[in-house]
């Protein structure tokens, strides 16, 4: 495990470290050696006629595919509630990443890690 998981220094690191025992979550932190991993990637762009300003928590680009991972601390009862609540945001991020990288949207996976439910939710 990474050093920060074994010895978390911040509240955010403690929250994520507590989720790392879940295999599906841990897998998202083990990209291929060829992958480019960006953390807390700030984006500002116009999507259609809407200004989008946000931070992609984790963006993994590997060849002609990508994965956007967004951590959510919402206290939702179900994964479906979180998916519905955040789907539009992640889809907007995917469109922006697609424009920047030229990776088609259908090759960009959208994942939510719920720190409350300790699960991965595919959007």
Give residue spans per PLM region.
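A non-catalytic, helix-rich entry segment at domain boundaries
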Residues: 1-46, 119
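Mg2+/Mn2+-dependent nuclease catalytic core
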Residues: 49-123
């Amino acid at each position: 495990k990474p050093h920060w998981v074994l010895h978390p220094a911040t509240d955010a690191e403690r929250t994520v470290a507590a989720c790392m025992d879940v295999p599906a979550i841990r897998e998202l932190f083990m990209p291929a050696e060829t992958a480019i991993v960006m953390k807390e990637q700030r984006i500002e762009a116009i999507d259609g006629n809407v200004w989008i300003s946000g931070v992609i928590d984790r963006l993994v680009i590997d060849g002609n595919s990508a994965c956007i991972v967004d951590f959510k601390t919402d206290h939702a009862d179900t994964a479906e509630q979180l998916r519905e609540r955040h789907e539009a945001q992640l889809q907007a991020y995917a469109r922006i990443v697609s424009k920047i990288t030229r990776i088609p949207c259908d090759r960009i996976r959208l994942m939510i890690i719920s720190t409350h439910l300790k699960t991965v939710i595919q959007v």
